[in-house]
């Protein structure tokens, strides 16, 4: 099949879009694949749809290979099933909510777990109907606070979501592994590097969750790896907890004057100058307990202050804090929050003062106090004394203060020990390209999805959920393969097999180009033919680079002698070839 560029609905651009942050966004717009309609919302043009359809075709082939069957749900759905599982509230402002003319609450679906479960409940009633895997490729909607990077993080996006249904946990494990293996094949066919990491389940819930992350410097996620094979999203990383320390015999806590210590380092310097350690070792930032006040907004709209104690050489990671306090929204407390709690002395906050406990549910402030896992019983700290200009030395956990709980909210760094003992971790950036969940019985229980088992007993079905971002994967392939001059698609999803560029005004050249296109078409190749008569060769070559078909055939003056040029966009090499041999050479290379 051939497509004439003179007839194709496309307009390439010389200038970058002003809001483009990453190469894929810039080039997909300039090459005429997508056009912005609103923040995070894009129209798909013919070139873009060709690539998108090929990504979807790969996904469909791999789903069919494992026996998953395709269905299709509406994007506009009633809110009630989401309310039944609690996700209507858990999604918070990220869910598009609306009402119909009868004032019934509706949503634009972010995911479809509830409705897949209800469909199976409506149709199946016996274990003999299971296992079942069904999927759809559907547009999803999430009201992102900050849409960015073009189609990498938009408010409308296309996703493949699959769901498995089993009546035993062993069956779920088999279904989960089949989907996991299919995902690996999909990403290999797309040519995307990936790392499988342990992940937090978030609003989805469930007993097991793994992400497929594509390592990229533009990634929004941080993940960690160890030499021994441990891998996790930083949000799911768990700190290796040190052993408790004997409390008996430790020095008593003592308050010391510490004016003009606006930073941890100035506090450490002052402590070393005025209060040297008895063991001769210098105080370090890791000996201090930094107490950070966070404001949590709960689902019912109430606002709660929580103080998190972390070692002073660490910082709060708000993404990890959001996981720790899910489903509440988390932000740093402001001066107004502190003003309402005069017991919290800014710059000198700590769990204890000379008057007694300050933080914790049983303290004078009643402010919840949670700590990093490294704050074990017997650990001794320098921290605030809740009096302006004063800190306390040798404040011992389990003796002088008892936190309300432990949370993973501190940042994770290169060299931290992996929790499984497999060595020091290294951190990297990545973007999620797929996510698989063992949901267990969360949704089935909430929605009453049961079947009769082998003994005639009603049992709750166990589910798995498996998502791949179609449009996100397309953008990441574009990002990973572009060469600075333009897009450079892998053959598996290129919009065309070959791009024929005709140059010159000689009628013989035009005839030769037409005959070549016919021969390529007859050979089963999908051809983009740049037949534009009044466009210069330089513009045509620039557009060929932008559009990104990996193989270009240039038909120019040499055509009168039966010759053309093969331009390999991957290597940028041009090779003379007889026109009569072009079709054979390209079909042999497929």
From Swiss-Prot:
Principal place of residence: cytoplasm
GO cellular component terms, semicolon-separated: cytosol
Top-level division of the source organism's lineage: Bacteria
ATP-binding found in the keyword field: yes
GO biological process terms, semicolon-separated: prolyl-tRNA aminoacylation
EC number: 6.1.1.15
InterPro entries the UniProt entry points to: aa-tRNA-synt_IIb, aa-tRNA-synth_II, aa-tRNA-synth_II/BPL/LPL, Anticodon-bd, Anticodon-bd_dom_sf, Pro-tRNA-ligase_IIa, Pro-tRNA-synth_IIa_bac-type, Pro-tRNA-Synthase_IIa_type1
Cellular localization per UniProt: Cytoplasm
Catalysis performed (reactions): tRNA(Pro) + L-proline + ATP = L-prolyl-tRNA(Pro) + AMP + diphosphate
Coiled-coil intervals, chain numbering: none
PROSITE patterns recorded: AA_TRNA_LIGASE_II
Subunit-level organization: Homodimer.
Record-stated family: Belongs to the class-II aminoacyl-tRNA synthetase family. ProS type 1 subfamily.
Domain notes: Consists of three domains: the N-terminal catalytic domain, the editing domain and the C-terminal anticodon-binding domain.
Matches recorded under NCBIfam families: PRK09194.1, proS_fam_II
Record protein name field: Proline--tRNA ligase
Lineage: Bacteria, Bacillati, Actinomycetota, Actinomycetes, Micrococcales
């Amino acid at each position: 099949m051939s497509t004439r560029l003179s007839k194709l609905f496309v307009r390439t651009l010389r200038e970058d879009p002003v809001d483009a942050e990453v190469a894929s966004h810039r080039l997909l717009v300039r090459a005429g694949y997508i056009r912005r309609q609103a923040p995070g919302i894009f129209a798909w043009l013919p070139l873009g749809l060709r690539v998108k359809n090929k990504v979807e075709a790969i996904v469909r082939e791999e789903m069919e290979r494992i026996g998953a069957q395709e269905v299709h749900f509406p994007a506009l759905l009633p809110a009630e099933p989401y309310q039944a599982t609690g996700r209507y509230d858990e999604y918070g402002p990220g869910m598009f909510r609306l009402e119909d003319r009868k004032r019934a609450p509706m949503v634009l679906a972010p995911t479809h777990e509830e409705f897949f479960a209800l469909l199976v409940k409506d149709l199946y009633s016996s274990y003999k109907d299971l296992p079942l895997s069904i999927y759809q490729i559907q547009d999803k909607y999430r009201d992102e606070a900050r849409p960015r990077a073009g189609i990498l993080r938009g408010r409308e996006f296309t996703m493949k979501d699959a769901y498995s249904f089993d009546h035993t946990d062993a069956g779920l494990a088999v279904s989960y592994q089949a989907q996991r293996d299919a995902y690996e094949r999909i990403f290999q066919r797309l040519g995307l590097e990936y790392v499988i990491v342990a992940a937090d389940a978030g609003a989805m819930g469930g007993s097991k969750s793994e992400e497929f992350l594509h390592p990229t410097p533009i990634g929004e996620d941080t993940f960690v790896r160890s030499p021994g094979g441990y891998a996790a999203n930083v949000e799911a990383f768990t700190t290796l907890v040190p052993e408790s320390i004997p409390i008996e015999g430790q020095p008593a806590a003592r308050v010391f004057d510490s004016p003009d210590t606006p930073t941890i380092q100035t506090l450490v310097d002052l402590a070393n100058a005025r209060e040297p350690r008895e063991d001769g070792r210098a105080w370090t930032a890791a000996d201090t307990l930094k107490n950070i006040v966070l404001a949590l907004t709960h689902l019912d709209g109430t606002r709660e202050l929580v103080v998190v104690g972390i070692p002073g050489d660490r910082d709060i990671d708000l993404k990890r804090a959001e996981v720790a306090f899910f489903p509440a929204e988390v932000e740093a407390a402001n001066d107004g929050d502190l003003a309402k709690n005069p017991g919290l002395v800014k710059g000198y906050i700590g769990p204890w003062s000379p008057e007694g406990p300050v933080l914790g549910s049983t303290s004078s402030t009643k402010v919840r106090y949670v700590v990093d896992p490294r704050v074990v019983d017997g650990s001794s700290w320098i921290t605030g004394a809740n009096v302006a200009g004063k800190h306390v030395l040798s404040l011992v956990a389990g003796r002088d203060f008892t936190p309300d709980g432990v949370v993973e909210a501190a940042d994770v760094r290169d060299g931290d020990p992996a929790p499984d003992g497999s060595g020091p971790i290294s951190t990297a950036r990545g973007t999620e390209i797929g996510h698989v969940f063992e949901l267990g019985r969360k949704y089935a229980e909430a929605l009453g999805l049961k079947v009769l088992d082998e003994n005639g007993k009603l049992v709750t079905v166990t589910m798995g959920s498996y998502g791949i971002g179609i449009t996100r994967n397309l953008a990441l392939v574009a990002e990973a393969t572009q060469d600075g001059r333009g897009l450079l698609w892998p053959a598996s999803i290129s919009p065309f097999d070959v791009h024929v560029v005709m140059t010159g005004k000689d009628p013989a050249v035009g005839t030769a180009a037409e005959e070549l296109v016919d021969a390529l078409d007859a050979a089963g190749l999908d051809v983009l033919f740049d037949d534009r008569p009044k466009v210069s060769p330089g513009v045509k070559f620039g557009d060929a680079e932008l559009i990104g078909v990996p193989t270009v055939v240039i038909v120019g003056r040499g055509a009168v002698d039966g010759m053309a040029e093969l331009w390999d966009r991957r290597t940028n090499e041009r090779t003379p070839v007889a026109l009569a041999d072009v079709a054979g050479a390209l079909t042999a290379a497929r």
